[in-house]
Amino acid sequence: IEVETDASEFDAARGAHTGCPGRKSHMGTKADKEKEYTVSELIDMGFKHIQWDGSTPVPIIDCFGRIIAVLAGQPEGSYGSELHEAFCFMQKEASDSGLGKKSKEGPHKCGLFPVLLRGVTMGMGNPHPVSLNPKTMTHLLNRLVGHAAVQRMAKYQNSAFGLWAPRIYEEYRNVHDTMHSKLNLPENFPGTIFAAAAFNLG
């Protein structure tokens, strides 16, 4: 899929590990952000509706042929049922742990659901990588990252990343390997290069 945009003109933050959330002027009013648009409304606004089977990998490229995003698809076999299994498992674990809209981990700027983080971060002013694991939910997070269906999702994402963005992947891998060779830090999914994972338990 080719889009009429130049990736070199995208907004970018200066920090090496800082996200750039976008300008407020581009995000619209509170009502704009909360509105649920229909497909017809989005098309009228200039969006293009692209049919996709959800399985076949499709790269999205800018006007110079640079890959800027990928619809990574999914592997063949029982992957779809495993995704549903992982979803149900996460829902049950969240419910059994008392997580919901009214819990302290509840609604936040990303949605009306609790989010738990596990892994390693270098943010929040830390001079070196530190663990993200919340002490009160360690057992829950250990069960989540240990679940076979969740592990398969992580490994597929890891493989897709390495296939479609090999140079960035190699940089991630080098940092990952260096960090874990020097520091005793948790690793969510052995064999993958992602430092952290966010579990949306809504």
Regions found by a protein language model. Give the residues of each.
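Fe(II)/2-oxoglutarate oxygenase catalytic core
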Residues: 1-201
